[in-house]
Amino acid sequence: RAPRGERLERIWRSPNYRDGAFRNRHATPQLTSGKGWWATMYDFLFERKERNRPDHALPAVKTDLKALDPKENLLVWFGHSSYLIQADGLRILVDPVFETASPLPFFNRPFEGTDLYKPEDMPGIDLLVITHDHWDHLDYGTVTKLRDRTGRVVCPLGVGEYFEYWGFDPQRITELDWGEQAALGGGFTVYCRPARHFSGRTFRANRTLWASFVVETPSQRIFLGGDGGYDTHFADVAREFPNLDVAVLEDGQYSEDWRYIHMLPADLKRAVEDLGARRVFPVHNSKYALARHPWDEPLNNAAALAAENPEAGIVLPRIGEPVRLDRSDTLPGRWWTAPEN
């Protein structure tokens, strides 16, 4: 439901909310095809797509997440933009979607082999972070099943309306505007920073905010990029938070038809260079087909970038494979290639 009451009054006071909607820092047309919304959507739905879904089951690792030592700093990716981070004893779950990423059960079906994890597989979550309200990042079925095992929700301004409506304790919901922060105690702080995107679960857009986040722990600085196109906010984050340990960046579901709201391959390279993080995890791929590009193109582009610049620290794990943040693990090669017969 739409924000209301005190939450809506706070939205009205936001410097990022103007003329009835949240706005990006710079002009950001959602579509750049020149063909209009309906024509662009028609092309997306009905134009022939080359290999936008794999023809084989993707290899994945089923890890017993509840058995992981919470003191071990690690990241486990669940495909698309869902992942678990453990940092200095804090368990952080980001944008969990363990069901169909769509209001329609037959649309946005996960690729074969990628639907390995369910809400019941998750350990107790200290911090649930939602970057925006799109269906592939905020899933009712998933978060309500996690409700009783979640300590605190952190989300952009306005998104808390969903959680309150879905039965979460308002005292455990922290909504942040760009430039705001929340101290969690014990040396943990979450900072809300811009992203270049949009929001909405219906035809009315931008009534809630979208964001990136920086999570600071006693030993880690972690950038959660969320969704969005390239802009100056990556360099701004790097200046404010030098020596990032980890950056999780969108890599996939892009198109020249919407180049300002999802990063193109060349934009990923620029964002990696701007942030200068020690390790980079490209996500937003390998589970759903939300664009016309070949399903493995984002992985191949990231692998090429890693080969071109080994110092970039690009990590491409399999779904469900724990990656230790305190050391350079040896990971499998191009796991996404089709198995030989």
Where do the PLM segments sit?
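Divalent metal-coordination and catalytic microenvironments
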Residues: 85, 95, 132, 139, ...
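Cap/insert and terminal regions of metallo-dependent hydrolase folds
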Residues: 6-20, 122, 127, 152-161, ...
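Metallo-beta-lactamase
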Residues: 1-109, 115-121, 156-226, 245-251, 301-320, 325-328, ...
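Acidic/histidine-rich helix-loop elements
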Residues: 98-115, 200-204, 255-261, 289
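Catalytic core of the metallo-beta-lactamase
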Residues: 82-86, 183-243, 259-267
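Metal-dependent catalytic neighborhoods of phosphoester/phosphodiester hydrolases
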Residues: 139-148, 290-300, 326-327
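Active-site metal-binding motif and surrounding structural segment of the metallo-beta-lactamase
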Residues: 14, 106-154, 174, 242-248
